[in-house]
């Protein structure tokens, strides 16, 4: 018997149908010589410090550097304790039995670093010795699964990928555990969350936020001149920016007095805008956020769903290129789009004999090629799924179309010794931009409709005004700009080639960045204000401590990610990486233990353990190293006073506090209470009896 293990039940069912396994059992499907079973995500992970005999947060325990790591079934919290998830334990028992009976195992977990780790951790935990081979496919279509099963690869081909995944997992454990505990000790206990990837990401958001808020806008003035030729009016802007209104008005008077403006230079250039590269996951997430407001996690979830429904290829890809053999399939995929209503007309006009080859490069593909639609066309999709599907399908058509050609005109004009400029553009060939037929975003001041103008033209000054402007700070990060910053380890690169070159040295991977961002929301370090990412007071309190520490070094984190990529390709050995992480961890633990965090001990006793509570500018923390009680000062965007904090901790409830802010705007009044898990929650005063009576009467 052969055992096939998929990453989740839905994928297992698809594979079972292909291999003829139809007999459903508890935890697997069997038939035709196969047993098709599944994990459900990470069934096995690294044990917490308690399993190594290390309890509590104590200075003398740090740094915690296990000589070897203990694997355990996935844990769930019950009260203050963690225990093995019963469902996971049951499935591991089924896997143990199946693996023991198998002639060989076919590994069909996701074809990537994390998918490899999911299987290898299970295999190691079960102490299995059954030989295994790898099913490595880029889509879940029936054809792809059949071809993959006919070309199974030896399991040891992916040993380096596993070593990279294992090194990443252990590095995250070592850095996260030690950094969080060191900061907790330095802060007087409580629970703090730091991580190898999470904290530099937080630093990117916070640094931009503080820069934005500290920005002092400068006012300047520009002249806006109206002129015309042959009945076509247009406006031009002064190149000079005046630092005062009086200077601008004086220049304006000179221009009006001159009555004419002379064209001193006309430059016309043909601009060829090459088609964009195919999507990788990060680029898809960035554009879905900027165009539709989708979070990175939402885009990934939709893309994963489309993949599992066989409509697109493997989504967790970091490549924007396809190989020569995949390129041979593109004409058929374009032909397929003639049956998809939105793209039918355009796809029918494409000349598949002369397609752009900009995204075809064998050397720029690692595990998976760029995102593509499959041969399967969707018939019914909800609005959000349709958006993401059409982004992927539309991008394929754009990528293999011709360039967009424009004729750009740049004018320089002069009046009364003051220079003015204007820019116009005429579309010569729409090219790839005809796929979506969306307007090109241009800055209003940069584009104008120009008549036929030649150097030496003397044109009338039909009007001249002053425009008051202000310098602007760099905007707060959105998920789109944050993903771009993570991709390049904080470097701002607009050149596509430079961004591609930096990919292996970014923060996180395409598969993990959405989860990193969502962790920041889950831990209330960041909130969304429209599309902008705003750090909470909790987040700023952490950043104030770590901003100059190695744990927040964005470039260093990018270097670690590059090292992990080299382990996967065999260019670096995992033990060297591990030793480097241990040295780094020892350094950050020392730095954080020496951190000074201001706080004042109060007379308030901890409601959980009775030990003294320390009041800090952003929070109150219990001093007991084994307690970890933390109450944050800012609730509903309102900062609690020491008196309100003390009342909450001693009585379990405050009086009514006015001025909490709703997520959507507006304020409300409420009392605060501590629940049985010592979490803060709102308590609203009941409505008065007469109003309730009227409401009941209406019913």
Name every feature range the model reports, one short phrase each.
Residues 1, 109-111, 188-193, 268-277, ...:
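Conserved short loop/turn motifs at secondary-structure junctions
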Residues 1-169, 173-175, 473:
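Intrinsically disordered, low-complexity regulatory segments
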Residues 2, 81, 88, 125, ...:
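Basic, low-complexity terminal or inter-domain segments flanking catalytic cores
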Residues 9-16, 33-36, 40, 59-62, ...:
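Amphipathic alpha-helical transducer elements in NTP-driven molecular machines
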Residues 87, 100-101, 142-225, 268-272:
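C-terminal or mid-to-C-terminal helical accessory/interaction module adjacent to the motor/catalytic core
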Residues 186-193, 205-248, 291, 315, ...:
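C-terminal helical "lid" subdomain and adjoining coupling/linker elements of P-loop NTPases
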Residues 243-279, 285:
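Metal- or metallocofactor-binding catalytic centers and their adjacent structured scaffolds
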């Amino acid at each position: 018997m052969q055992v096939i293990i998929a990453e989740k039940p839905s994928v297992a069912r698809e594979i079972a149908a292909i291999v003829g396994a139809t007999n459903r059992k508890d935890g697997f499907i069997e038939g035709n010589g196969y047993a098709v079973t599944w994990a459900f995500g990470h069934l096995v992970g690294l044990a917490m410090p308690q399993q190594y005999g290390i309890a509590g947060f104590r200075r003398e325990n740090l740094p915690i550097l296990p000589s070897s790591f203990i694997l355990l079934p996935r844990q769930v919290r019950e009260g203050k304790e963690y225990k093995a998830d019963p469902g996971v334990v049951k499935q591991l028992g089924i896997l143990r039995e199946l693996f023991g009976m198998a002639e060989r195992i076919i590994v069909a977990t996701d074809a990537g670093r994390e998918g490899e780790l999911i299987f290898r951790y299970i295999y190691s935990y079960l102490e299995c010795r059954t030989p295994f081979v790898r099913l490595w496919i880029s889509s879940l279509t029936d054809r792809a699964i059949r071809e993959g099963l006919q070309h199974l690869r030896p399991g040891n081909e992916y040993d380096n990928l596993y070593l990279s995944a294992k090194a990443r997992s252990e590095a995250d454990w070592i850095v996260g555990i030690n950094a969080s505990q060191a900061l907790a000790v330095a802060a007087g206990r409580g629970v703090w969350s730091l991580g190898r990837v999470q904290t530099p990401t937080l630093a990117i958001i916070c640094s931009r936020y503080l820069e934005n808020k500290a920005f002092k806008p400068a006012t300047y003035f520009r002249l806006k001149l109206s002129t015309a030729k042959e009945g076509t009016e247009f406006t031009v802007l002064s190149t000079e920016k005046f630092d005062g209104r009086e200077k601008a008005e004086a220049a304006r008077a000179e221009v009006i007095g001159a009555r004419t403006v002379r064209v001193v230079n006309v430059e016309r250039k043909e601009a060829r805008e090459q088609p964009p590269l195919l999507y990788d996951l990060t680029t898809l997430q960035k554009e879905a956020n900027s165009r539709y407001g989708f979070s990175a996690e939402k885009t990934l979830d939709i893309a994963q769903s489309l993949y599992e429904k066989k409509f697109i290829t493997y989504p967790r890809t970091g490549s924007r290129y396809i190989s020569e053999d995949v390129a041979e399939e593109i004409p058929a995929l374009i032909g397929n789009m003639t049956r998809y209503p939105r793209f039918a007309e355009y796809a029918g006009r494409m000349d598949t004999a002369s397609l752009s080859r900009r995204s075809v490069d064998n050397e720029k593909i690692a595990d998976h090629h760029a995102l593509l639609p499959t041969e399967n066309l969707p018939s019914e999709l909800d609005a959000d799924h349709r958006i993401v599907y059409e982004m992927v399908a539309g991008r394929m058509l754009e990528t293999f179309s011709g360039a967009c050609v424009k004729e750009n005109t740049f004018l320089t004009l002069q009046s009364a010794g003051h220079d003015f400029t204007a820019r116009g553009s005429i579309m010569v060939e729409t090219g790839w931009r005809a796929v979506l037929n969306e307007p090109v975003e241009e800055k209003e001041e940069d584009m104008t409709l120009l008549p036929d103008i030649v150097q030496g033209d003397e044109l009338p000054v039909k009007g001249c005004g002053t425009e008051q402007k202000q310098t602007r700070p760099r905007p707060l990060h959105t998920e789109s700009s944050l993903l771009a910053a993570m991709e390049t380890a904080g470097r701002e690169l607009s050149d596509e080639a430079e961004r591609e070159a930096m990919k292996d040295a970014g923060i996180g991977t395409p598969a993990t960045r959405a989860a990193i961002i969502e962790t920041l929301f889950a831990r209330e370090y960041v909130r969304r204000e429209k599309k902008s990412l705003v750090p909470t007071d909790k987040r700023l309190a952490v950043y104030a401590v770590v901003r100059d520490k190695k744990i927040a070094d964005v470039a260093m984190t990018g270097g670690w990610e590059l090292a992990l990529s080299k382990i996967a390709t065999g260019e670096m050995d995992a033990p060297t990486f591990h030793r480097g992480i241990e040295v780094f961890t020892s350094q950050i633990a020392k730095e954080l233990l020496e951190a000074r965090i201001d706080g004042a001990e109060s007379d308030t006793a901890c409601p959980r353990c009775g030990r003294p509570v320390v009041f800090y500018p952003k929070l109150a923390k219990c001093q007991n190293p084994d307690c970890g009680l933390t109450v944050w000062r800012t609730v509903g965007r309102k900062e609690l006073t020491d008196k309100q904090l003390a009342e909450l901790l001693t009585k379990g409830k405050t009086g009514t506090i006015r001025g909490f802010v709703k997520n959507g705007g507006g304020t409300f009044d409420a009392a605060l209470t501590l629940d049985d898990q010592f979490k803060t929650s709102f308590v609203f005063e009941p409505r008065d009896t007469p109003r309730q009576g009227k409401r009941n009467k209406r019913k």
